[in-house]
């Protein structure tokens, strides 16, 4: 299993263009590729901070004609490591993004985190890079 790795996380979105704009303009990702499947009526967009060969990416799936999805209570969040969580949140807010939990240490711990909401309501956790490798330590 040494060659196994996570390739992508798929999120269903109601407005693909709006979601691509959020992940590129607000979160600083690049649109890596986009393709349509006319037979099954969906469009996929893959976004990330680097080439897919270098790490996991986000797959946005737009099912034609579906504007909203029931997210249920099982989904938690996507986590992204950032170099300066405070500056990153300032940049996200300046670009029109919604920070739902301001940056700061986890209650009872020292790891600095923040949360951001994407246009479809998916939560994104930001973790200070120097602490990201250790997880949420106390």
Swiss-Prot record:
SUPFAM superfamilies: Glyoxalase/Bleomycin resistance protein/Dihydroxybiphenyl dioxygenase. GO terms for biological process: methylglyoxal catabolic process to D-lactate via S-lactoyl-glutathione. Residues 5-129 form the VOC domain. Keywords: Lyase, Metal-binding, Nickel. Pathway: Secondary metabolite metabolism; methylglyoxal degradation; (R)-lactate from methylglyoxal: step 1/2. Gene3D superfamilies: 2,3-Dihydroxybiphenyl 1,2-Dioxygenase, domain 1. Ni(2+) binds at residues 8, 59, 77, 125. This is Probable lactoylglutathione lyase.
């Amino acid at each position: 299993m040494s060659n196994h790795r996570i390739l992508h996380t798929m999120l269903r979105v109601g407005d693909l263009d709006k979601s691509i704009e959020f992940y590129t303009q607000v979160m600083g990702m690049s649109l890596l590729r986009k393709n349509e499947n006319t037979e099954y009526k969906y469009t996929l967009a893959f976004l990330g901070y680097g080439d897919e060969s270098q790490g996991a990416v986000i797959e946005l799936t737009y099912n034609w004609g579906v504007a909203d999805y029931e997210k249920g209570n099982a989904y938690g969040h996507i986590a992204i490591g950032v170099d300066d969580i405070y500056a990153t949140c300032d940049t996200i807010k300046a670009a029109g993004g919604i920070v739902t939990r301001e940056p700061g240490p986890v209650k009872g711990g020292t790891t600095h985190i923040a949360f951001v909401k994407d246009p479809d309501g998916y939560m994104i956790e930001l973790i200070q890079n120097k602490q990201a490798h250790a997880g949420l330590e106390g």
